């Protein structure tokens, strides 16, 4: 681990053969079980709407949490409108979501052995929080309450309970040069995404104090944040700026908003985990990603991964790609990367929010002095 700013991370290439999740169905079966969570808790899930009157902004927030055993309905992977939008974007089979089986129960009672640490989950641009279900269910089964905010207009679509929807809209000037676009993206991250994170944290405090369902279950002295792509940038910014967040993880996002090294890096002075693809790690800005970072920073390069490997995309696409047969080899690769991602993120937050051991994380990450 890094304890002084004079230390630097040595990225290492990781190819780990892990036991495949037991409930991953064979590709020729009709239904497809997402990988089973590996923790001791059953998982529940609820989706709520948080309204910020000051900013005239509504946010859909999905929460996965440790639950008691329940016979309540198994949660759908996503609603039909969201699935239709994703199927169009990713060229998936119509109604694929009906065949994807999750492991969370809708509105299951919360486990009584709380309160539980909180992990905020931040999505990338033009996707939806549901594509991080495997990661979210895994964290929840290991004793974390996961809070995933849908951030319009950065998400692919937000479908609210009353039926109205908001779709992805670019928030950067399309015809501008790369640096100008990067400045616009950084401004959006600061003024919208990090503001959303802070608003959600404020609402969690209210919920823990007064809400009938959540009262006493949220340990808000132990908060982490993990994000992918643009969500990784959000996670880095929020970890830097928000004192309530103790640790963060960035899944192949940039610490340079808009991937522009001349805009500004984001130094992080708290425990932080980077998971990166080989392509990202070999980029010209990679060596400066963590300039100024200190206090237990990890940088892991995942061999063979692509940008979407840190989501459910590889699992879903290998099974439900339109006009092609299921790809068993692609499914196996996706399972390996998904399992590795979940394991390292779970261990990282267990270490820094629960003071637990992190044997796999500490085994594969090494540092040296400059």
Label the model's feature ranges:
Residues 27-119, 330-334, 345, 350:
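Domain-level recognition of soluble alpha/beta enzyme cores
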Residues 31, 291-370:
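C-terminal catalytic-base region of ester-bond hydrolases, centering on the histidine
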Residues 64-68, 82-85, 130-178, 303, ...:
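Active-site machinery of serine-nucleophile hydrolases
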Residues 103-116, 121-159, 257, 280-282:
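Short substrate-entry loop that stabilizes the transition state in hydrolases
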Residues 159-217:
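Alpha/beta-hydrolase active-site loop
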Residues 199-264:
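Primarily recognizes the serine-hydrolase "nucleophile elbow" in alpha/beta-hydrolase
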Residues 246-308:
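The feature captures the conserved acid-bearing segment of alpha/beta-hydrolase catalytic domains
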């Amino acid at each position: 681990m890094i304890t002084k700013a004079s230390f630097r991370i040595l990225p290492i290439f990781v190819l780990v053969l892990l036991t495949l999740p037991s409930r991953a169905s064979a590709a020729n079966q009709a239904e497809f079980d997402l990988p089973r969570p590996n923790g001791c808790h059953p998982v529940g899930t609820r989706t709520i709407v948080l309204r910020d009157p000051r900013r005239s902004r509504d946010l859909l927030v999905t929460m996965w949490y440790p639950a008691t055993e329940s016979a309540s309905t198994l949660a759908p992977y996503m609603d039909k409108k969201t699935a239709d939008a994703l199927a169009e974007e990713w060229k998936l089979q119509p109604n694929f979501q009906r065949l994807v089986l999750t492991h969370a129960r809708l509105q299951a009672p919360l486990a009584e052995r709380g309160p539980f640490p909180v992990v905020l989950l931040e999505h990338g641009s033009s996707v939806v929080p549901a594509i991080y279900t495997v990661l979210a269910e895994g964290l929840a089964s290991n004793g974390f309450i996961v809070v995933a905010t849908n951030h319009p207009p950065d998400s692919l679509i937000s479908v609210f309970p009353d039926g109205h929807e908001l779709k992805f809209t670019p928030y950067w000037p399309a015809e501008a040069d790369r640096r100008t676009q990067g400045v616009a993206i950084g401004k959006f991250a600061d003024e919208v995404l990090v503001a959303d994170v802070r608003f959600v944290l404020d609402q969690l405090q209210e919920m823990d104090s007064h809400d009938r369902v959540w009262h006493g279950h949220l340990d808000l002295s132990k908060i982490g944040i993990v994000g992918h792509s643009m969500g990784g940038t959000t996670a880095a910014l929020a970890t830097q700026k928000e004192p309530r967040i103790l640790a963060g993880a960035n899944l192949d996002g940039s610490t340079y908003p808009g991937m522009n090294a001349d805009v500004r890096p984001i130094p992080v002075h708290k425990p932080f985990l980077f998971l990166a693809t080989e392509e990202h790690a070999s980029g010209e800005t990679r060596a400066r990603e963590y300039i100024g970072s200190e206090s237990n920073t990890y940088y892991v390069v995942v061999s063979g991964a692509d940008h979407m490997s840190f989501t459910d995309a590889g699992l879903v696409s290998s099974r439900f790609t339109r006009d092609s047969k299921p790809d068993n080899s692609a499914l196996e690769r996706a399972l390996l990367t998904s399992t590795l991602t979940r394991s390292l993120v779970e261990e990282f937050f267990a270490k820094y929010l629960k003071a637990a051991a992190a044997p796999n994380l500490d085994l594969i990450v090494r540092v040296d002095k400059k």
